[in-house]
Amino acid sequence: MNLNYLDFEQPIAELEGKIEELQLVGNSSDVNLADEVAKLREKSTKLTETIYSKLTAWDIVKVARHPQRPYASDYISRVFTEFDELHGDRHFGDDKAIIGGVGRLDGKPVMVIGEEKGRSVHEKVMRNFGMPRPEGYRKALRLMEMAERFKLPVLTLIDTPGAYPGIDSEERGISESIAQNLAVMSRLRTPIVCTVIGEGSSGGALAIGVGDHLNMLQYSTYFVISPEGCANIIWKTVAKAPEAAQAMGVTSKVLQDLGIVDETIPEPLGGAHRNVDEMARKLQERLVEQVEQLSREPIDALLERRYQRLMSYGN
């Protein structure tokens, strides 16, 4: 895979470019450059470690939005088996920005719901760039209520720039659909594990984000408004987005310190897009353990703990 490098990764890109040049020379001649390539690879790894150890909140926002970052569909295909997608909200239509269905996690049946941005131009348009409309959240609600009836744990994968704010979305009740999901998820009689895999923005993320355990991938973000939106409101310019990201505390580390996030799942060096299979394996391991722990708890005790968890926010 040809990596797209972010602005702060340019020194890494230059080193990787030199490695490619040496490999081309070595492949087209009898000169053995393996030692030189190995040295440069080691140097590139150390440089990546140094750069990623000093990321600002704004840098992490960029990583969370990386165009090659794995999406919900990438994790669903790797983490779950026998996945059968279910469609439609039974009211209006089928929103492609929400993927949901029944699958197996370590052989046990679960309900999986994820927000999907789409990779190609065609997919992005079809998925509405990961911005669900009311029918998307109502589809998610239908699947969660189905999971409750069949006693299936619910696993959500959060990755959205926000709920779609268009006129058609407002006409069909986007605020009501989000509010209804929040209310139902808070009392759903089955374990719920939520994971922010990329962008977790505003009510669009919260609509599938209420549960018993909240994970964030190391370089994902979670916020009530985008840093650009915050900067535009406070400073009247998007140029202040880096300062807004820092002030808002959008990273997994800050949110875990505040007690909002339960667990940060480490990513491969350089972000999840550098090694999707490794990231999927780590996510699977954590989800298996978390679902097993929650499933052992009596449902009434689980609901009480979920209620207390929600009531503790802001205290």
Swiss-Prot record:
InterPro entries tied to this protein: Acetyl_CoA_COase_a_su, ClpP/crotonase-like_dom_sf, COA_CT_C
GO biological process, one term: fatty acid biosynthetic process
The entry's keywords: ATP-binding, Cytoplasm, Fatty acid biosynthesis, Fatty acid metabolism, Lipid biosynthesis, Lipid metabolism, Nucleotide-binding, Transferase
First-level EC class: transferase
A GO cellular-component term linked to this record: acetyl-CoA carboxylase complex
Enzyme Commission code: 2.1.3.15
One Pfam family named in its UniProt record: ACCA
Keyword Transmembrane: no
PANTHER family: ACETYL-COENZYME A CARBOXYLASE CARBOXYL TRANSFERASE SUBUNIT ALPHA (PTHR42853), ACETYL-COENZYME A CARBOXYLASE CARBOXYL TRANSFERASE SUBUNIT ALPHA, CHLOROPLASTIC (PTHR42853:SF3)
Protein known as: Acetyl-coenzyme A carboxylase carboxyl transferase subunit alpha
Organism: Cellvibrio japonicus (strain Ueda107)
